[in-house]
Regions:
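Charged, glycine-interspersed solvent-exposed loop segments at helix/strand-loop junctions
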Residues: 190, 194-293, 447-529, 533-534, ...
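C-terminal long alpha-helix characteristic of the crotonase
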Residues: 249-250, 282-327, 440, 498-504, ...
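Intrinsic disorder and flexible/low-complexity segments
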Residues: 325-328, 332-368, 489, 561-622
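Cysteine-centered motifs
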Residues: 10-12
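Flexible, low-complexity junctional segments that flank or bridge functional domains
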Residues: 22-70, 79, 113, 118, ...
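Cleft-lining beta-strand/loop regions that shape enzyme active-site pockets
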Residues: 60, 67-190, 199, 321-449, ...
Length: 622
């Protein structure tokens, strides 16, 4: 209670008290009313949804001859989206704001194999990606679609850079008369809060191993360290060069020419006709002309309707999937690695890898005699070292019974690499971010604020020297001695990490240390230093798993089940609930610009006494 009160005082110090309290009660009242209404109508919606589930289970999309699959490059795309509500279909909702990479790739493959689907239309150009490798995998799937001899047409009012990278695979790219392409190269700025904390009297203390382990720097420095600049420059240049090469091949221009366009001018403000001259697009076109272009490809009259299929439609198209042969399990582990998902949801975090839950799932796969091999799909920048070790141990036990092949997604770094290292074989996408072999602990000390500025002092008794070490760390004036023990604890954790990688990858500990030190690596570079075995896709990982298990005929099943949309509302001991995430939204609106630093404080207070195996905190491209 005392520490909670002190955190409240911290918040009051950095905000205007009257405004905060007024807004708090207003929003609390609105939240209570919203929850009451939610409880009243839930029963009604559940009834309708159950009827919708029955209807959707018994029906599938019928594909008409001469159809077009429309993929809208808007919203966001991530590793795996949660199951949608049956109400979507009943209410005629055909837009999916968050797209699962697994879903869209599955739909593209269905379209490739379906004779009635003649092509794909990519509409829009502002799709957000959780990682560079996610965009690369979507583009690769579209590239594979074209091998069937079918066409792809793309059109947008404007193209964000990474969406253009995806769309560049199309046979023809069209742009609105007043459209723009935001081609400018990769880059961005990171926030550093030390100056703010200095003014508040808050000091962050870091215990870490790894000169490249930069996660702590946003709280301990006022600018980027040379080591962090080095690693960020390396992986961003690698990703950008890969994107340039792919775009240049598709658009039949030189990569150097594209780079020059991004380097010499702000393409977002260019005249659309300049894009045609630069061969970035094929034609400046008005929206109503798109249909005419597609009808020409379909060889239908201008008055005929185009049979369109959305992503939702394609997901409901029956697959020609063959369930014969042995089973290979594909287990998805994506998001931050946590001990409990409740805290993550309260802070507005996305999907998480819960240590205990994931370890239990992997043990079940180990005991399932029907599963002959496992592909462990990892897309994580790490998190709790304790949870990471739980999962790693489960992977090791699984490997003792059947082959385990890791398929790395957008990132498999720090804790993500920790849980990957015991596998028989590691396959990574060319633009996967991996490595980050390092450990840290991060503790905020509030004595400068609470004692020096607010006048709160502390006194007490104890039976032993360090009985109150946790309070001394956070509120004491001289926590240096305790931090020495904290550093020793982190040092041991790093040595454990080195041993884990050494045993898993067959590399000497000294060599692991030389390529470790918290440094992130692009997968194409990680291949050269033996952190991964092959650059390839999830399909390549499945083929390798079948090879190791000596399977001639096999089929794949995905785990864990996505669960129904109803599950999102139900509280769980480890996973939290929908209402938890709603509380986060209320606090974010209340705190405004102060939300990020205060949530950082909250998280480090919660996790600071534990080792963290977490990579640098922002690897998105835009």
């Amino acid at each position: 209670m005392r520490f909670t009160f002190l955190l409240y005082l911290c918040s009051c110090y950095v905000t205007i008290n009257h405004f905060i309290m007024k807004q708090f009660f207003k929003m609390t009242f609105a939240t209570v009313c919203g929850i009451a209404i939610f409880l009243v109508v839930t029963g009604f919606f559940l009834t309708i949804s159950l009827l919708g589930m029955v209807a959707s289970d018994s029906a599938s999309t019928k594909v008409k001859d001469n159809s077009v699959f429309v993929i809208k490059l808007n919203g966001n795309i991530e590793e795996r989206a949660s199951a949608g509500s049956p109400l979507d279909e009943l209410l005629g909702v055909d837009e999916i704001s968050t797209i699962g990479l697994d879903d869209v790739i599955s739909a593209i493959r269905k379209a490739k194999d379906n004779e009635d689907i003649k092509g794909i239309y990519l509409e829009g150009g502002s799709l957000g990606f959780d990682a560079p490798a996610t965009a690369q995998q979507l583009r690769d799937a579209l590239k594979d679609f074209k091998k069937s001899g079918k066409w792809i047409v793309a059109s947008a009012n404007q193209y964000h850079q990474v969406s253009y990278y995806v769309a560049s695979v199309a046979d023809n790219i069209y742009l609105n008369d007043h459209g723009a392409i935001d081609l400018r190269g990769l880059g961005g700025k990171r926030e550093y809060y030390k100056g703010l904390y200095d003014k508040l009297g808050i000091k962050y203390m870091a215990a870490k191993v790894g000169k490249y382990k930069s996660y702590v720097e946003s709280n301990t420095l006022t600018g980027m360290s040379d080591y962090d600049r080095e690693q960020r420059t390396a992986y961003q240049n690698g990703i950008w060069n890969y994107m340039l090469k792919e775009m240049a091949e598709s658009r039949k221009v030189k990569a150097e020419a594209l780079n020059q366009l991004a380097n010499d001018s702000i393409m977002a403000f260019a005249d659309p006709n300049d894009y045609v001259k630069a061969r970035l697009i094929d034609k400046v076109i008005f929206p109503e002309e798109i249909k005419a272009e597609i009808k020409k490809r379909l060889k239908i009259d201008k008055d005929d309707d185009i049979h369109q299929l959305t992503l939702s439609d394609m997901l409901n198209v029956k697959s020609e999937k063959d369930d014969d042969g042995d089973k290979i399990a594909i287990y998805y582990a994506y998001g931050s690695i946590v001990d409990s998902e409740t805290i993550n949801k309260l802070q507005g975090g996305g999907h998480s890898i819960v240590g205990k839950t994931t370890a239990e799932d992997l043990r079940k796969l180990a005991d399932d005699d029907d599963v002959k091999a496992v592909v462990f799909r990892v897309n994580s920048g790490g998190g709790s070292a304790v949870a990471s070790e739980q999962i790693r141990h489960a992977v090791k036990l699984l490997k003792a019974k059947k082959p385990v092949v890791v398929s790395m997604g957008g990132a498999a770094a720090s804790g993500g690499y920790w849980i990957s290292s015991p596998a028989n074989y590691i396959v990574a996408e060319p633009t996967t971010i991996t490595g980050s072999i390092g450990i840290f602990g991060l503790i905020p000390n509030f004595s400068g604020l609470v004692t020096d500025k607010l006048g709160v002092t502390f006194d007490g008794v104890k039976t032993n020297k360090f009985s109150d070490y946790d309070e001394e760390l956070i509120l004491g004036k001289n926590p240096d001695e305790i931090m020495k023990y904290m550093q020793t604890y982190v040092d041991k954790g790093y040595q454990q990490f080195l041993t884990i990688v050494s045993e898993g990858r067959g590399i000497k500990p000294a060599e692991v240390d030389s390529i470790g030190q918290g440094r992130v690596w692009l997968a194409s570079d990680a291949l050269k230093i033996k952190l991964v075995d092959k650059l390839g896709s999830l399909d390549d990982a499945v083929k390798k798993a079948a090879e190791l298990a000596k399977l001639k005929e096999y089929h794949c099943e995905t785990y864990p089940n996505k669960g129904s949309w109803i599950d999102q509302f139900m509280p769980d001991e480890d996973k939290g609930s929908y209402l938890d995430s709603q509380l986060h939204k209320e606090f974010k609106a209340l705190l405004g610009d102060l939300y990020e630093p205060l949530m950082e404080i909250r998280q480090t207070v919660k996790e600071g006494s534990r080792m963290q195996a977490r990579m640098l905190d922002d690897v998105r491209v835009k």
